[in-house]
């Protein structure tokens, strides 16, 4: 299940966008998410094994080429359904009443950390570049759930 534009795992946000309804985002929607495709995670591991000594003792991120904001993500996801995103923003404390406790906690964790990693080290030491963007990883996941 992909993390959705609200920062949680519910498919409800995607369904709201598909239906052209207003999607409420927490805070200002400028927090970031950084998805990764499973093939790219495996690719980093495989490249590290193949490279050998230059990878020993090193840590590598496995992420797509760049992070996305909640707002940008919502707009892109709406376009997959042929829609324009109708977005509204609420302070987290107000917004969390709209979702389950689990989703509210997940969103808060993502907002507080606002993940954004770099693949530069993997490129430099392993000659590895991810094959998939954030959006490609999410789209493929949604397709597997029959949501696209």
Can you say where each PLM-predicted feature lies in the sequence?
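Flexible, glycine-rich beta-alpha linker
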Residues: 1-13
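A conserved pocket-lining segment of Rossmann-fold NAD(P)-dependent short-chain dehydrogenase/reductase
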Residues: 15-36
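Conserved loop-to-helix N-cap of the C-terminal "lid" that shapes the substrate pocket in Rossmann-like
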Residues: 29, 34-42, 59, 67-71, ...
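Conserved C-terminal active-site "lid" loop/helix of NAD(P)H-dependent oxidoreductases
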Residues: 38, 71, 97-129
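Non-catalytic, hydrophobic alpha-helical segments
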Residues: 41, 45, 62, 73, ...
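Amphipathic terminal alpha-helices
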Residues: 132-148
